[in-house]
Amino acid sequence: MLIKNVKVFTKDKKFKNGAIALSGDKIKAVYTEANMPDSDLEETIDGNGAYAIPGLIDLHFHGCKGDDFCDGTKEAIARIAEYEASIGVTAIAPATMTLPVEELEHILEVAVEYKKENTDKRRADLLGINMEGPFISPAKKGAQDERNIIPCNVEICERFLKASDGLVKFIGIAPEESEEAIDFIKSVKGKVNVSLAHTNADYKTAKAAFEAGANHAVHLYNAMPPFSHRAPGVVGAVYDCKHVM
């Protein structure tokens, strides 16, 4: 199959008019106008001048088109995944909100059921789950429900990992909210990516968390102290730790 009349991204980091040849579900070749094949020899699809790029991966969003991942239904996940695929997002790791532990466990279990049952290739692949709460800071809660915020806890984290059958890929914490935060990070970092999320941590606390094994920061600059030269905070710690994404 040949997808013609598309803009392809080339080795010189520019979009150029071209085509993409497919063999089964694999890309066989990428062409520009300079080396275009004879399209009469293959089944063709007209890209109508669209940009042809690899599928995007969305690691942090809560829902779309009236559905929320925390609705806790397979139908909601299916509609979310189908819409995401329609706009070029081919893999997703939707985020949870700060909800009661038992409710979060149910949401995770439903996601596992969905992933096992789904065979529809028109939907974005559910690669994982991003847990934005409940281990966050009341001072930087944003739209999260303060009533359900709790300090990071290894036992509860293990419950989430078990309920999700390994689907939870990120879990956010506010390290300043617990004296056990460093031990928490060291205990779970081999099982899940620990992120700093909705945190009021200062530079020293954030740096210690990253040095202990946390490796991600949630919506940098937002829901954390502002960056300044005298108080660099979480933002400064992120830029001082090369392994943090």
Language-model segments: residues:
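Histidine-rich, glycine-flanked metal-binding segment
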Residues: 2, 8-53
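Divalent metal-dependent hydrolysis catalytic cores, especially in the metallo-beta-lactamase
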Residues: 62, 78-107, 123-137, 164-176, ...
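Active-site core of metal-dependent hydrolases
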Residues: 162-245
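Charged helix-capping and loop-helix junction motifs
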Residues: 73-76, 107-110, 153-155, 229-235
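Active-site loop-to-helix "anion-binding N-cap" substructures in soluble metabolic enzymes
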Residues: 66-72, 86-88, 93-103, 223-231, ...
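Divalent metal-coordination and catalytic microenvironments
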Residues: 6, 20, 25, 49, ...
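Conserved phosphate-binding/catalytic loop of the ribokinase/pfkB sugar-kinase fold
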Residues: 137-162
